[in-house]
Amino acid sequence: MNSRMIAQAGTDEWYIARRRGVSATTVAKASTPAGFKEALNNALNPVEIPDNGYMRFGRDYEQWIVENIPQTYGIQANDWLVCADGPGNEWQLATPDGLNNDWSVIAEVKTTGKEWPTYHQIPIQYRRQVQWQLHVTGAELCVFAYLLRAETADGRLVPAWYAPELYEIQRDETMIAELIDTAQKLQQEIIYHEEAQRGTL
């Protein structure tokens, strides 16, 4: 097992590790002034996110979406939290939905109620998540796979397509540098406030 694989999703170790670092979801949120405050508050005062039908639909179809990514990418489903390479980078975290064997290609999976016909119509927070995951894993390419959902007359959520739509997303070093800067500032704020709460400043 790769030494940068920290814990599997849903385990106590996974939750503990995420609280000690900055994940793709967190740094994407923290990339605006209001989002930074919210991300900091969430880190210092974590609360459980209420479950809903959209989230359950996403979980139910995540494995299916990964399995429908062409085999040429060599992607396998992943639920391990991984950290960035190099000493002192253990706090830079990501859980890509899929990885190939040498981590040169990752996958990110989404379900949505709205089509994204072009790359730039993908919500910016998702594009930021992808770039952070590319940074943490060191991958050069992300296969972004998304599935449109529809609602039946009786309120059930079902796939609107027979297969997910795919985008190939390359590394954006400018965005990655911005995300690293944001993540470092957030991590510093988290450490400062935690030390203040413990009275160790």
Would you name each region that the model predicts?
Residues 1-60, 64, 68, 72, ...:
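Charged, glycine-rich intrinsically disordered N-terminal tails and low-complexity linkers that flank
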Residues 17, 194-195:
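Long, compositionally biased, charged low-complexity segments
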Residues 72-194:
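Nucleic-acid nuclease catalytic cores
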